[in-house]
């Protein structure tokens, strides 16, 4: 058996372990959410997290509670107040769902437009062309011909009745076209050029600054991007929030306005960013909450719809009530969050090479760029899109730092391997790799090591007991006899 097969098996076990951890975490997220819904104002998040951590392991499984929780998170029917929403049938361009504030925002007659004698009424079945000027209606209809409609965002439209301009932000959902409408403020310069180009121009200076950085320092990279986002958006606090292997989070870099309590270096439990929310960040990479105290707006759907309209891709989607309470408790009234999505590291290159080419670049959520503000704050779509560009460039450079770290690590390993090999050649006994300087612990990052040779055990630092090492050796020869080596995060999971 080739050496790649055991490595591939180890890689597969690691993936299975990761999937099991995510499932267990999702179950815990669901239990905490259920406790929040039931307890209301008496909900004590810290106490419950500690109880879960110190208590028995979470029972895994797709229970009804977990499924209901995921549906509740991903299929909410509320939006925020900074815009309105329409869902359109792609064939007829008729409205099949609308937010309760849409009629007022899109059809209110303005005295500045006196020629409107019979203003359109907005409801289920209304043809969206009747709501906007010919140019805007044509631009919206043009989106139907694009496989990726987001490439056109934002589309500038004008209401027939009021003449007011709106950014139309379009995406496809199951069975329909969902359009977010955000008013263009009088102080804004409307995005008349291609949306992506306009947004890139806004982020160009920050992107140039990041691209000019020398490699080799993740801290410098994070500090730079945090400073650029702070200058670009004007929020009170900006953080680079990094996820660790066990899914807990750390504030890795931070900049604040004067007088704010620093969060830098703080670690938060995995439940702080639920798995369902992480999934949504992989789908919709920029998330803005303008005012956590504002009342959410209901979305009304046609009664005869054969499918459920998902708002997962909507920029207007209202946050979960638990998160709103969490924000208010932190005195963070508004937030803007960008997902940092990087290539998933495969620990074994040979195992990776056995996979089809299209599967080699799996993605994962490295962390988040998080902006907090102590008062309501709205960031227009072109600037949000610029922040998304910036986060993408940042992610590319995070990947580069991973590669540099990997190359340096491999270089040091080869150097140490050569030194230890020379020591073994010079000495008649392998004891030199545990008794000498350097020793085997300098080759592999670890808390302890052990050598079993001639029936005797030599232990270094935080290693298992002698009897446990004998048990592990017997297990390896029995279960993994054909393996040239074994690497695992859990001996239990490895069999």
From Swiss-Prot:
PTM description: Contains one covalently linked phytochromobilin chromophore.
Keyword Transcription regulation included in the entry's annotation: yes
Spans annotated as Disordered: 1-24
Position of the signal peptide: none
Domain GAF: 217-402
Presence of keyword Magnesium: no
Transmembrane domains' residue ranges: none
InterPro entries, sorted: GAF, GAF-like_dom_sf, PAS-like_dom_sf, PAS_2, Phyto_chromo_attachment, Phyto_chromo_BS, Phytochrome, Phytochrome_cen-reg
GO BP terms, alphabetized: detection of visible light; regulation of DNA-templated transcription
Any GO molecular function: photoreceptor activity
Low complexity composition-biased segments: 1-21
Keywords: Chromophore, Photoreceptor protein, Receptor, Sensory transduction, Transcription, Transcription regulation
Positions bound to phytochromobilin: 322
Quaternary state and interactors: Homodimer.
Role summary: Regulatory photoreceptor which exists in two forms that are reversibly interconvertible by light: the Pr form that absorbs maximally in the red region of the spectrum and the Pfr form that absorbs maximally in the far-red region. Photoconversion of Pr to Pfr induces an array of morphogenic responses, whereas reconversion of Pfr to Pr cancels the induction of those responses. Pfr controls the expression of a number of nuclear genes including those encoding the small subunit of ribulose-bisphosphate carboxylase, chlorophyll A/B binding protein, protochlorophyllide reductase, rRNA, etc.
Family: Belongs to the phytochrome family.
Protein name: Phytochrome A type 5
Natural source organism: Avena sativa
Organism phylogeny: Eukaryota, Viridiplantae, Streptophyta, Embryophyta, Tracheophyta
Gene coding for it: PHYA5
């Amino acid at each position: 058996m080739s050496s790649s097969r055991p490595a591939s098996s180890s890689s597969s076990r690691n993936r299975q372990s990761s999937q099991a951890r995510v499932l267990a975490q999702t179950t815990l997220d669901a239990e905490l959410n259920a406790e929040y819904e039931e307890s209301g104002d008496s909900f004590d998040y810290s106490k419950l997290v500690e109880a879960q951590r110190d208590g028995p392991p979470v029972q895994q499984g797709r229970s009804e509670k977990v499924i209901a929780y995921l549906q509740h998170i991903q299929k909410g029917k509320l939006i925020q107040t900074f815009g309105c929403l329409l869902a359109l049938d792609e064939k007829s361009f008729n409205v099949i769902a609308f937010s309760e504030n849409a009629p007022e925002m899109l059809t209110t007659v303005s005295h500045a437009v006196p020629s409107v004698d019979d203003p359109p009424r907005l409801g289920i079945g209304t043809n969206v062309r009747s709501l906007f000027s010919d140019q805007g209606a044509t631009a919206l209809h043009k989106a139907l011909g694009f496989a990726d409609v987001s490439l056109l965002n934002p589309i500038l439209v004008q209401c027939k009745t009021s003449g007011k301009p709106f950014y139309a932000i379009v995406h496809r959902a199951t069975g329909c076209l969902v359009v977010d409408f955000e008013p263009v403020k009088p102080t804004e310069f409307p995005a008349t050029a291609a949306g992506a180009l306009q947004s890139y121009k806004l982020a160009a200076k920050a992107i140039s600054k990041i691209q000019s950085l020398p490699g080799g320092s993740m801290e410098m990279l994070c500090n730079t991007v945090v400073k650029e986002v702070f200058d670009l958006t004007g929020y009170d606090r900006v953080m680079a929030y990094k996820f660790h292997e066990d899914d807990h989070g750390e504030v890795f870099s931070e900049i604040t306005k004067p007088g704010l309590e620093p969060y830098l270096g703080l670690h938060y439990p995995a439940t702080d960013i639920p798995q369902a929310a992480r999934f949504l960040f992989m789908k919709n990479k920029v998330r803005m909450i303008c005012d956590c105290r504002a009342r959410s707006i209901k979305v009304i759907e046609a009664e005869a719809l054969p499918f459920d309209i998902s708002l997962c891709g909507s920029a207007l989607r209202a946050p979960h009530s638990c998160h709103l309470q969490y924000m208010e408790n932190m005195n963070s009234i508004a937030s803007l969050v960008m997902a940092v999505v990087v290539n998933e590291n495969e620990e074994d290159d040979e195992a990776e090479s056995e996979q089809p080419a299209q599967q080699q670049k799996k993605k994962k959520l490295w962390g988040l760029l998080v902006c907090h503000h102590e008062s309501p704050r709205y960031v227009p779509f072109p600037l949000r899109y610029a922040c998304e560009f910036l986060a993408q460039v940042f992610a590319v450079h995070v990947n580069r730092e991973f590669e540099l770290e990997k190359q340096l690590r491999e270089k040091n390993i080869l150097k140490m391997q050569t030194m230890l090999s020379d020591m073994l050649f010079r000495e008649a006994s392998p004891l030199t790799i545990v008794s000498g300087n350097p020793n085997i612990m300098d080759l592999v990052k670890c808390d302890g090591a052990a050598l079993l040779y001639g029936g005797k055990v030599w232990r270094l630092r935080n290693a298992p007991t002698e009897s446990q090492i004998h048990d592990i050796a017997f297990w390896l020869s029995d279960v993994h006899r054909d393996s040239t080596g074994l690497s695992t995060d859990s001996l239990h999971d490895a069999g």
